[in-house]
């Protein structure tokens, strides 16, 4: 595999259509978008087959944690939108079968009680969330007099870089263990903690991981930290071979007690999550606030930047390719 060239995000953006297979109708495909507060967004294409395999990955690592995604009661805490008529009643969630889907947008000192009351009432076996979504709740819980009486197996976090400070506070506040999941929108790698270790187990059925130095060479024996290069197995529609993820991984030399012969990462170093301030002066994680908009086709958006000078209002700067300038109202529609 070392004879293949390394693919960068910029190269993908400039040659996007060349990476999509030609023998399928593009209208039948699904697309998702990568990015951050200052970044060049990338549209990643896939089909239903990849989506099924992606779901199977979740089922697999949850089974490794002795959890059943179909039967176990759980809470999802992300940037989901909740109907206004519910918000007006201090209900910031919807219930679907054995799952409560909560919105992280409304967590503050005034609403904390309602979130905690619902969590206590529902008694989930696990909570699935982003670090930046659960952290404000953990912080408020840690500072207050309200205590939860739960029997949580885990809090499972993904989608962002998890700091040691976040892990420690979340575990302390909820009296349970945090399981970190590593993945990315491009879908070439999935890694997870296990019952015996917080080290990330890179699932071999999903793709190949390489850790390379600044000269794109394999790490020397004594060096543990390198850029993560991913080769995915499951996305026939949009194959990625030796893709530079932009993440930095720290190699682990231990053999995990779980017995799985996976490549292990001690940790992944990434960008600490950014926040914006809403009208009520609450900190809102910027990733779910912006990147719920996967309906947008970001092709033609070379770069974007998010700036906030006034609470409750953000300015999005778009650097568009010349052809897309004619269609800029299409993009602006989604940000109103």
Question: Over which residues does each language-model region extend?
Answer:
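Nucleotide 5′-phosphate-binding alpha/beta core
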Residues: 1-33, 39-72, 121-128, 148-150, ...
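Short, solvent-exposed polar/charged micro-motifs at secondary-structure junctions
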Residues: 2-6, 84-86, 189-192
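Gly/Ser/Thr-rich beta-alpha loop segments that engage phosphate groups in nucleotides
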Residues: 38-41, 81, 161, 185
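A short secondary-structure junction signal
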Residues: 44-46, 88, 240-242
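Glycine-rich, histidine-containing beta strand-loop boundary motifs that form or position
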Residues: 45-47, 78, 130-131, 182
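Conserved AMP-binding loop of ANL adenylate-forming enzymes
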Residues: 59, 63-94, 102-105, 159
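Active-site glycine/GP-rich loop and adjacent strand/helix microenvironment
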Residues: 94-336
């Amino acid at each position: 595999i070392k004879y293949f060239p390394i693919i960068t995000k910029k190269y993908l953006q400039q040659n996007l259509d060349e990476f999509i297979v030609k023998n399928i109708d593009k209208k039948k495909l699904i697309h998702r978008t990568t990015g951050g507060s200052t970044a060049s967004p990338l549209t990643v294409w896939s089909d239903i087959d990849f989506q099924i395999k992606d779901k199977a990955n979740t089922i697999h690592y949850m089974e490794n944690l002795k959890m059943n995604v179909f039967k176990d009661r759980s809470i999802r805490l992300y940037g989901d939108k909740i109907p206004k008529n519910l918000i007006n009643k201090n209900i910031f969630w919807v219930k679907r079968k054995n799952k409560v889907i909560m919105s992280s947008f409304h967590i503050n000192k005034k609403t904390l009680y309602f979130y905690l009351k619902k969590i206590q009432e529902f008694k989930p076996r696990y909570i699935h969330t982003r670090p930046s979504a659960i952290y404000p709740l953990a912080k408020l819980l840690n500072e207050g007099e309200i205590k939860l009486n739960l029997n949580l197996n885990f809090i499972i976090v993904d989608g962002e870089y998890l700091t040691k400070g976040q892990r420690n506070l979340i575990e302390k506040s909820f009296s349970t263990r945090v399981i970190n999941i590593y993945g990315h929108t491009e879908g070439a790698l999935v890694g997870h903690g296990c019952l015996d270790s917080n080290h990330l187990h890179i699932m071999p059925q999903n793709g190949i991981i390489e850790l390379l130095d600044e000269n794109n060479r394999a790490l020397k024996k004594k060096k543990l930290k390198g850029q993560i290069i991913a080769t995915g197995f499951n996305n026939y529609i949009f194959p990625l071979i030796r893709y530079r993820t932009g993440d930095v991984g720290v190699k682990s030399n231990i053999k995990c007690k779980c017995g799985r012969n996976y490549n292990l990462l001690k940790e992944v170093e990434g960008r600490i999550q950014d926040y914006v301030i809403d009208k009520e002066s609450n900190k809102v994680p910027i990733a779910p606030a912006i990147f719920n908009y996967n309906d947008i086709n970001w092709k033609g958006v070379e770069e974007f930047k998010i700036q906030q000078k006034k609470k409750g209002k953000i300015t999005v700067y778009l650097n568009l390719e010349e052809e897309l300038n004619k269609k800029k109202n299409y993009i602006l529609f989604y940000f109103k």
